[in-house]
Amino acid sequence: MLFNNNEEINQALQGIATQDNGDLVINNADKLRGDILDKLVLNAATNPSAEIKGLSRFIIKSAALELGIVNSSIQGLYETRGRGEIKGFTVPALNIRGLPYELCRAIFRTAIKTDAGAFIFELAKSEIGYTFQKPQELSTVILAAAIKEGYKGSVFIQGDHFQVNAKNYAQDKEKEIAGLKTLIEDGIAGGFYNIDIDTSTLVDLSKPNVVEQQRANFEVGAELTKYIRELEPAGITISVGGEIGEVGKENSNEKELRAYLDNFNEILEKEKPGAEGISKISIQTGTSHGGVPLPDGTVAEVNLDFDTLENLSKISRESYGLAGAVQHGASTLPQNLFHKFPELETAAIHLATDVQTITYSRSL
């Protein structure tokens, strides 16, 4: 059901919730989790009226806060890990490409059932484009799913692979960076308080030394991180991720890691003294997005370099205070290897293909 005006929304909320001087007061949380919430989600995503769409989103986000559901940055957890105060876990980041409300409900149900720790919902720059899900819409739907399933606590929503297009950058670098800054603005305004900046596409292995190979990567990465720090809401330190090896390309190594982080930190401190840097670093260890399809429809097994993953995670924590290294393309690995990630202190793994496959093949 699409609402025709704001009054219809207020009537539907009678006895359930009321607006009071810009705040939302919940009178009956159980009824809020009923059909009215589903209607609000539908209108928040699809109502042709910007006013009705906006009010529906406001009600959902306000209700989430009232019910103890907080859209958050994972920065504090990553900082604690970087100090060595906690260990032995890996944070999964799940790409929400389709059926977002139903899928996120299933994720929250599973999290409650298993008493899960931290987990992240995310959407990449490319996925925002082809799924037509803007940050403001997706964050609303995720919070609504949390309300529906009775979840309480922090909710982490991430912009994944906010990536520089190398070809476009070569043709007009100012235009390409401006486009990414607009995406960052939209992401932060939409509640993406975790953003992975991917400038690894600018790494040029034809250069004579590792610093020059990584130069465009750390220079543009520092510029975009500075921009995030200038936009982040008061009281929130957005968790920013960096990347040194493009997924599907050459495996990363210690020299690349140190060249990127040393120069990134130096530039950021010079441009914005005291600014928080990145909290984690994505590396390449042998995976590719979506895997390598074989003629029979299966996906080729991946030879993952676990030694590199462990070593670079350790260096990033002990030398730079990061949470550790991040493994992209983890869906391409057999499930019997997943125990290796927390054992090796991997900060996070990104899961997109598996989540999409579940959406296609199973009941939510």
Walk through the language-model features, giving the residues of each:
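Helix N-cap and loop-to-helix transition residues
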Residues: S49, P100, T131-K134, N209, ...
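Short beta-strand segments
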Residues: E122, Q158, D198, G241-E243, ...
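Glycine-rich, proline-tolerant flexible connector loops at the mouths of alpha/beta enzymes
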Residues: P92-N95, F119-P135, V164-K167, I197-R215, ...
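Active-site capping/gating regions of soluble enzymes
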Residues: M1-A44, G54-S73, L180-K181, I188, ...
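Generic detector of well-ordered alpha-helical packing
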Residues: H161-V164, I197-T199, I244, G329
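Alpha/beta catalytic barrel-like cores
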Residues: M1-G159, N165-N168, D172-E176, T182-L183, ...
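Short amphipathic alpha-helical segments, especially helix-boundary/capping motifs
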Residues: T80-E85, D115-I120, L202, G235-I238, ...
